[in-house]
């Protein structure tokens, strides 16, 4: 077998920086029209995953704090599949490693593995989400 000639390829992916990411999160949530779709006092699940979000704990906390300030009762759900060994306890531990805990977030963190199909994607694939949500 002959190996064809190889060439070095380098890709630089742009990584924009937000000067005030928590402030941008607040602005986006407040301008999202959420209050027209969910009544004050309603519960809202905040999905927190494990796929390389920089400063994920501060992003999650900004989301939770904004929702609380708007009169909602947020809680966090693990938004990951096989990470954490695909177990509730493993995902709870993984979130804790990212400093996402009930104590640090000020809300409940639910990592049960039960999920429901919410609908289908434009290409017909099922969309699953945490049953607690």
Residue ranges of predicted features:
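Histidine-anchored nucleotide/phosphate-binding helix
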Residues: 54-73
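Short glycine-rich or small-residue beta-strand-to-loop segments that form or flank ligand, phosphate
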Residues: 43-52, 75-82
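Glycine-rich phosphate/diphosphate-binding loops that line cofactor/substrate pockets in enzymes
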Residues: 29-45
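Short, well-ordered amphipathic alpha-helical segments that serve as non-catalytic structural scaffolds
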Residues: 22-32, 60-63
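Active-site histidine-anchored catalytic micro-motif
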Residues: 70-92, 104, 111
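N-terminal amphipathic/basic leader segments beginning at the initiator methionine
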Residues: 1-25
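Short glycine/serine/threonine-rich phosphate/pyrophosphate-binding segments
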Residues: 53-60, 85, 117-125
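An acidic, phosphate/nucleotide-engaging active-site surface
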Residues: 90-133
């Amino acid at each position: 077998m002959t190996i064809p000639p190889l060439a070095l390829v380098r890709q630089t992916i742009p990584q924009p920086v937000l000067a005030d990411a928590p402030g941008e999160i607040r602005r986006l949530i407040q301008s999202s029209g959420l209050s027209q779709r969910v009544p004050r006092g309603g519960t809202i699940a905040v999905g927190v995953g494990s796929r390389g979000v920089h400063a994920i704990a501060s992003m999650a906390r900004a989301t939770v704090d904004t929702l609380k300030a708007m009169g909602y009762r947020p809680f966090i759900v693990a938004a990951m599949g096989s990470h954490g060994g695909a177990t509730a306890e493993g995902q709870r531990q993984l979130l804790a490693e990212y400093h996402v805990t009930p104590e640090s977030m000020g809300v409940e963190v639910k990592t049960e593995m039960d999920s429901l199909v919410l609908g289908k994607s434009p290409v017909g694939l099922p969309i699953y989400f945490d049953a607690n949500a």
